[in-house]
Regions:
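Short, acidic/polar linear motifs in exposed loop/turn regions
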Residues: 1, 38, 55, 114-117, ...
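Surface-exposed binding patches on compact interaction domains or structured appendages
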Residues: 1-27, 117-144
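Short acidic/proline- and small/hydrophobic-mixed sequence motifs that coincide with surface turns
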Residues: 1-4, 58-60, 116-121, 160, ...
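Short strand-edge motifs at loop-to-beta-strand transitions and within beta-strands
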Residues: 26-32, 94, 144-150
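Extracellular/luminal low-complexity segments enriched in Ser/Thr/Pro
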Residues: 31-41, 150-157
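Short, solvent-exposed loop/turn segments enriched in Ser/Thr/Gly
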Residues: 37-50, 101-108, 158-164
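Long, low-complexity ectodomains and other extracytoplasmic segments of secretory-pathway proteins
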Residues: 54-110, 114-115, 172-187
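C-terminal soluble interaction/assembly domains
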Residues: 108-114, 122-126, 131-168, 176, ...
Length: 187
């Protein structure tokens, strides 16, 4: 007989197995319930839980759970949408041409809140640890302009590179903006 349990389960996940104990040849199910209100995060998330068999850790037994947390704007009235924040970027792509290995490429992305309510930056996520980006401010008033510097560390990479930054806000028409830094890294 086999009983599964999980370690490192975050507070926003509820994991259950059915049946609780598997008999030889029997099938079971793992149920995962995700509560985004408890996650305090936005955008793509991944959690890797270790599976224990009969209370013991087993090498390479990982259970991955992914989710994409987005704001629900479906209840907004037409008036609320008309008065909502609106993010407008000067540029969403920066082509740095060529850069040498083990250097830094930086670019300042500029944007404006063209809406009538405060624009809130929920999260900025890069697709590679080699790229960093931090906003100057997380609340942009109506009509206000702001910017942030994105830095790509070329490291030992070579060839064509394309790094993405996901800019997540409370703009109901464009809650996630994908920004790109691209170019060729040479020796």
């Amino acid at each position: 007989m086999m009983r599964l349990s999980f370690t490192s389960v975050p507070k926003y996940l509820d994991i259950k197995t059915k049946p609780k104990v598997l008999k030889p040849g029997e099938e079971g199910h793992i149920w995962a319930k995700f509560d985004p209100r408890k996650a305090d995060d936005w955008g793509f998330m991944i959690d890797r839980l270790k599976i224990q068999v009969n209370g013991k850790n087993v090498n390479r037994n990982l259970f991955s759970i992914t989710a994409k947390i987005v704001e629900d704007f479906s209840d907004l009235s037409p008036e609320e949408r008309a008065n909502a924040p609106k993010v407008k970027f000067e540029n969403t792509t920066y082509d740095f041409g060529t850069a040498k290995q083990h250097t830094k490429v930086s670019y300042t992305f500029k944007f404006k809140n063209e809406g009538k309510r405060d624009l809130k930056i929920r999260k900025m996520r890069t697709t590679c640890g080699c790229t960093t980006a931090e906003p100057e401010s997380t609340v942009i008033l109506p009509g206000e302009e702001s910017s942030f510097k994105a830095i790509f560390h070329t490291g030992g990479r070579s060839g064509y590179q394309r790094k993405l930054i996901y800019f997540i806000t409370n703009d109901p028409e464009r809650s996630t903006v994908r920004l790109t830094i691209k170019g060729k890294v040479i020796k």
